[in-house]
């Protein structure tokens, strides 16, 4: 009897255990279904965010995509190759993650974005001297005899080439370079440094860095403009460039001329009121209406012409000379193209004119 009871007891235990297992299995299956639905919904939301990033640069919840890339639910990068059109109309496939960029004469802007090129522009053995500390270890490519051959460029293994002027792309060079790596061409990057920095930042996934750099420069220029205005007023400022081939008065549309006359709002001579530059000679010099003059000995190669002009009685009789308001500009960066150079120029102008 006791044995039969024990057998019955064990039988009930087996039945109860089986029932419990069924309940547990059903619960687990239900939970897994909920988890799958939840993960699918989360994946859909993340996919929507990534699409928003690719098309607008921002995610749907209002958070900015700093480098115009997204992340999936595992936190890995979702960068993808994209196609853009350069300023000459070429369709250019930009790599998902640019590692090795070659952008001769745009080293200033590259460094401002925190990017080192695989090689740098040089005239003979001299690159942009004011950038050499930051470009330490970056090989020089001599452009004095023309652009580097495709074979020479291939040795640096660039995955993106950026040409700062359309003249660099002429005579079949673009077609040759484009076979090495995707090649983006500006019409004239130096003509609008702010615009070209913005584009370069976008190409390299550094859009937010470019935006911050531009805001910082605008703030610096605005503060300098206020200081200069109280001293200079409506007087004119001139930039005279001495070079082996001649002497010229720089206008306000590019390089240091843009900084002085556009960013700092300083008046310019009527000789360059509508021109990018004007030739200067001893005969024309008396027409120069400027109370402040900055002198540039271009790459230290205009010494002979500088001496010829500045030792003449006509020069010595000019108001700016008599008043001690002629300043020698640093030719390393006054002919530079980029915010690093522009910031240095702003500092020079404020220090020279205001003494601050």
Describe the function of each predicted region.
Residues 76, 176-243, 339-356:
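Extracytoplasmic substrate-binding proteins
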Residues 125-130, 249-278:
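Alpha-helical, coiled-coil/dimerization segments enriched in small aliphatic residues
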Residues 27-31:
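C-terminal motif of bacterial Sec signal peptides marking the signal peptidase cleavage site
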Residues 2-21, 32-106, 209-237, 302-305, ...:
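Bacterial Sec-exported substrate-binding components of ABC uptake systems
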Residues 102-152, 166:
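A short, structured surface patch at a secondary-structure boundary
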Residues 291-356:
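Structured C-terminal subdomain patch of bacterial secreted/periplasmic proteins
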Residues 157-163, 182, 290-293:
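Proline-aspartate-enriched helix->loop->beta-strand connector
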Residues 126-128, 168-172, 188-199, 203, ...:
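Extracytoplasmic ligand-binding site segments that recognize negatively charged/polar headgroups
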């Amino acid at each position: 009897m006791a044995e039969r009871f024990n057998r019955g007891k064990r039988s009930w235990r087996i039945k109860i255990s089986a029932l419990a297992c069924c309940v547990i299995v059903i619960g687990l299956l239900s939970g897994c279904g909920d988890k799958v639905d939840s993960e699918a919904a989360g994946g859909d939301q993340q996919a929507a965010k990534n699409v928003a990033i690719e098309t607008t640069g921002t995610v749907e919840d209002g958070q900015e995509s700093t480098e115009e890339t997204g992340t999936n639910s595992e936190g890995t990068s979702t960068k993808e190759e994209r196609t853009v059109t350069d300023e000459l109309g070429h369709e250019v496939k930009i790599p998902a993650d640019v590692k090795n960029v070659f952008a001769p004469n745009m080293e200033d802007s590259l460094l401002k974005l925190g990017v080192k090129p695989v090689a740098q522009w040089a005239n003979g053995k001299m690159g942009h001297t004011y950038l050499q500390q930051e470009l330490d270890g970056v090989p020089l490519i001599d452009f004095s005899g023309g652009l580097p051959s495709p074979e020479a460029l291939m040795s640096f293994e660039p995955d993106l080439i950026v040409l700062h002027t359309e003249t660099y792309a002429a005579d079949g060079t673009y077609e040759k370079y484009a076979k090495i790596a995707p090649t983006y061409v500006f019409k004239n990057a130096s003509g609008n440094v702010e615009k070209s920095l913005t584009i370069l930042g976008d190409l390299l996934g550094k859009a937010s860095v470019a935006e911050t750099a531009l805001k910082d420069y605008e703030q610096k220029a605005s503060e300098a403009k206020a200081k200069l205005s109280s001293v200079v007023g409506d007087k004119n400022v001139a930039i005279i460039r001495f070079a082996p081939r001649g002497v010229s008065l720089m206008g306000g549309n590019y390089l240091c001329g843009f900084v002085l006359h556009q960013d700092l709002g300083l008046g310019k001579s009527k000789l360059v009121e509508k021109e990018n530059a004007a030739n200067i000679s001893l005969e024309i010099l008396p027409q120069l209406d400027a109370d402040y003059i900055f002198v540039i000995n271009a790459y230290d190669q205009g010494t002979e012409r500088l001496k010829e002009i500045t030792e003449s009685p006509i020069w010595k009789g000019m108001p700016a000379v008599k008043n001690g308001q002629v300043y020698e500009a640093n030719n390393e960066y006054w002919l530079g193209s980029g915010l690093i150079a522009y910031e240095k120029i702003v500092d020079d102008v404020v220090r020279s004119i205001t003494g601050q």
